[in-house]
């Protein structure tokens, strides 16, 4: 074992929400990766079978374990409407430093989320219609030549 392996290795957490704007009472899912820096390989390596703790607004809501790829997933019910802070913490273990990652998320009212979904659908349909009209205009222009 080299001397660099005897000291604690740096770790980092990367994380994201599957839906960063959930409605009240929906399930919020966060997934992420825990990695450590290997000085010899000069790269970040997945940290397998490590436990991370999940906090929402400073309160512990659960724990997750990383798989063989250093990936973890955790789901919990969305709290009340408003802005919230999620934190994923790795307390460290023999040979590995602790690390944490914070993410902010917004919980919406269910009706507000439905309106936003309808608006997104309408914008998509409008874009499709405009592209269709553009193709028709190009086709007609080419026919008149």
From Swiss-Prot:
Residues 1-23 form the signal peptide. The keyword Transmembrane applies. Its main location: membrane. Keywords: Membrane, Signal, Transmembrane, Transmembrane helix. It is a single-pass membrane protein. GO terms for cellular component: membrane. It comes from the Archaea. InterPro entries: Ig-like_fold (IPR013783). The chain crosses the membrane at residues 123-140. It is found in: Membrane. Coiled coil: none annotated. This is Uncharacterized protein AF_0657.
